[in-house]
A protein has these predicted regions:
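Bacterial N-terminal signal peptides that target proteins for export
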Residues: 1-7
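Structural motif
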Residues: 36, 223-224, 311, 351, ...
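Active-site neighborhood of divalent metal-dependent phosphoester/pyrophosphate hydrolases
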Residues: 67, 116-239, 260-262, 267-277, ...
Length: 477
């Protein structure tokens, strides 16, 4: 039997905070901080300063590939961070780390594919809360390992830092996280965003020290055809965050390389049962998800499983069964397609414009399945048109009310359609069901353009669930 390692943040009652900081260690964690297609970052900590090196090789060709030259760290340190670059896209690697104090660890990671049509899988694993229910947390993690995804995504509440009674409790909580996920962290790239229990608003929290990420709060992650918008929903700042999110959603919506836009964050805007959805997110973020056609929104926080009916066209999935105490859910609510209170994780099978999900209990039993299809209707080139600049609107009528239209008219307005700018026939662009129109952005536009589409023969309109598609204009040069 494999020897189990306790990832101990050594804690003795007589030690102060500074002493704690000198006596903890962590396992190796693989995350993406740069381009997921060609890089990965490995990070870990030791009790004492040491030098370290990393060796790695393509797992599928070990005989022909001798592996890259090991990367060495010249200066002794307690924290070791290695970013491996120039990797092959869509490849599984084995790695070994060594430090001069005798520590050796081995694990695996995967690089994202360069080909957007290359299939892959990922698992969603949320809400351990430091293994409050250790047996459940270990069982769910073992299930993730058995499912063998290419990487793991998490919307947080990994530990219970916020509600720990003292510093020793914080240490113990993270220690349980590492203990429960020991095999999972060694087997996969683990890409989290913070939950409220992780204390992301506290710059001195372990969240900021443990995870090497593009940003500790909000960041963008491109994996194959998916653009993940990883968002911190803990400290909500209303208009300023919404403005940033609108720009990122527009970039994704109008980028031809992005097939899927998937926001992922901790608190759910919609949840039915013992823990409800977040009203601030419904006010500020949900209208943006609708306007810019988010393909799927992932959250946790409510400890159970809820696959919602599409709300204004947007599918929402709440998965919080990673090991915290379970909450009751309401499977009969009209917003809910399927819900249950169970420990679980979710496997996503990505293949081009289709994602199939399987919600699984720790033993691998699939209790819910669903299929999603990428849903983008409108693209604008350039993505942020400037005043006086010529731009093109492409409208995909397939699957919508204008699918069979003999002619489609572009109805374009300034800001919230408080002034009509354009009402012109669109042209077919050679792709079935797709129409284009080119125009120059008037100088009178202050903030954004608004689009909807019209079939003049039948008198049928298409906007986005009573909200017009948006295009923020570029800032003044």
């Amino acid at each position: 039997m494999k020897a189990r390692r306790m990832w101990v943040f050594l804690a003795f009652g007589w030690l102060g905070v500074s002493a704690f900081a000198r006596t903890w260690e962590t396992p190796v964690m693989a995350t993406w901080t740069e381009d997921p297609r060609t890089s990965v970052t490995l990070a870990w900590e030791r009790h004492a300063e040491a030098t370290a090196r990393v060796a790695y090789r393509d797992r599928n060709h070990p005989a022909s590939d001798g592996g890259a030259e090991p990367i060495a760290q010249a200066e002794p340190s307690r924290r070791h961070v290695f970013t491996l670059r120039d990797l092959k896209p869509g490849t599984h690697y084995d790695y070994s780390v060594y430090s001069s104090d005798g520590y050796v660890a081995r694990g695996r990671f995967w690089t994202a594919p360069a080909d957007p049509e290359q299939p892959f899988t990922f698992a969603l694993h949320n809400d351990l809360q430091g293994g409050i229910n250790v047996a459940a947390a270990k069982a769910v993690s073992a299930g993730v390992v058995q499912a063998n995804p290419d990487f793991v995504l998490s919307t947080g509440d990994l530990a219970d830092s916020r509600y720990a009674p003292d510093y020793a409790g914080v240490i113990a909580s993270w220690n349980l996280f590492f203990e429960c996920l020991e095999d999972e962290l060694a087997a996969f790239t683990f890409q989290p965003v913070s939950g409220n229990h992780d204390e992301p608003e506290n710059p001195d929290s372990f969240w900021h020290r443990l995870f090497e990420l593009p940003d500790a709060h909000d960041y963008v992650l491109d994996v194959g055809p998916i653009r993940f918008l990883m968002l911190d929903s803990t400290e909500f700042e209303g208009p300023s965050r919404a403005a940033w999110l609108a720009r990122e959603l527009q970039k994704a919506a109008f980028d031809p390389a992005v097939v899927w836009t998937i926001p992922a964050f901790h608190r759910p805007p919609f949840s039915e049962g013992e823990r409800g959805g977040d009203a601030s997110l419904r006010e500020w973020w949900v209208p943006l998800f609708t306007k810019y056609e988010a393909d799927l929104v992932l959250s946790g926080h409510a400890h159970g499983y809820q696959r919602m009916q599409p709300i204004d066209g947007v599918p929402y999935l709440v998965s919080g069964g990673g090991g915290g105490w379970l909450y009751q859910v309401d499977p009969r609510h009209p917003n809910v397609a399927f819900a249950t209170s169970a420990y679980h994780f979710v496997v996503f099978r990505v293949a081009g414009k289709t994602i199939r999900i399987e919600a699984q209990t720790p033993d691998g039993t699939v209790f819910d399945r669903a299929e999603y299809v990428a849903r983008r209707h409108v693209r604008v080139e350039p993505a942020f048109p400037a005043r006086g600049e010529t731009c093109t609107v492409r409208y995909d009528a397939q699957g919508g009310p204008l699918e069979d239209a003999a002619q489609v008219t572009l109805h374009l307005g300034r800001d919230e359609f408080n002034h009509l700018l354009l009402d012109v026939p669109m042209e077919r662009d050679g792709v079935p069901g797709t129409w284009t129109a080119t125009f120059t952005v008037p100088d009178s536009v202050k903030w954004h353009l608004a689009f909807c589409f019209f079939d003049p023969a039948r008198g049928v309109w298409h906007n986005n669930h009573a909200r017009n598609w948006q295009a923020l204009v570029a800032p003044e040069r």
